[in-house]
Amino acid sequence: MQAYQRDFIRFAIDRGVLRFGEFTLKSGRTSPYFFNAGLFNSGSALAQLGRFYAAAIVESGIPFDVLFGPAYKGIPLAAATAVALAEHHQRDLPWCFNRKEAKAHGEGGSLVGAPLTGDVLIIDDVITAGTAIREVMQIIESQDGAKAAGVLIALNRQERGNGELSAIQEVERDFGIPVVSIVSLTQVLQFLADDPALKQHLPAVEAYRAQYGI
């Protein structure tokens, strides 16, 4: 586990974004942990989050020309990541996002920010069913000269969907692009094992992974 990954897990726990207990997911599964990126909801938290995304981009080595933040949750994530890349990695890259509803006046269209062209790195919080990413792929494919380079998310739950694959594996298979994450469940388990105060949650998370993991 990289230092930034350990720091991210601690940061997510401290902010209440990553919690342990008993939670019912939209899928109906009862999960021993819950991740809610919407709780990175202050200026300092967003700045720090952007630095973690930027670190994961550098670590991934994925080449790209523009960052794309899917509406709505991906918008502040892409903005914060673009700032962090410029300030901490001397990589001043363009970014853009989509509107849910196209505007008939002003700029017009459904895209805002830099032109969506070249290799596009999509920034989002998690991939649950893959539906949102499939919508984003349609947007990218509709732009001349644009193609998806990959997807970066905060947490990979490493969890099967209805079939044998996870939603992330299905996206990778269907679109031929890498999906990378700041951390995955593997690192969360490692963090729990190393933390005396949180180790009590390890058996439940391990059991959940044994049942639903990939």
From Swiss-Prot:
Pathway: Pyrimidine metabolism; UMP biosynthesis via de novo pathway; UMP from orotate: step 1/2. One of its GO terms (molecular function) is orotate phosphoribosyltransferase activity. It catalyses: orotidine 5'-phosphate + diphosphate = orotate + 5-phospho-alpha-D-ribose 1-diphosphate. 5-phospho-alpha-D-ribose 1-diphosphate binds at residues 26, 72-73, 99-100, 103, 105, 124-132. Keywords: Glycosyltransferase, Magnesium, Pyrimidine biosynthesis, Transferase. One of its GO terms (biological process) is 'de novo' pyrimidine nucleobase biosynthetic process. Orotate binds at residues 34-35, 128, 157. It holds the Pfam family Pribosyltran. It is an enzyme of class 2 (transferase). Belongs to the purine/pyrimidine phosphoribosyltransferase family. PyrE subfamily. This is Orotate phosphoribosyltransferase. It comes from Pseudomonas fluorescens (strain ATCC BAA-477 / NRRL B-23932 / Pf-5). The lineage of its organism: Bacteria, Pseudomonadati, Pseudomonadota, Gammaproteobacteria, Pseudomonadales. The gene is pyrE.
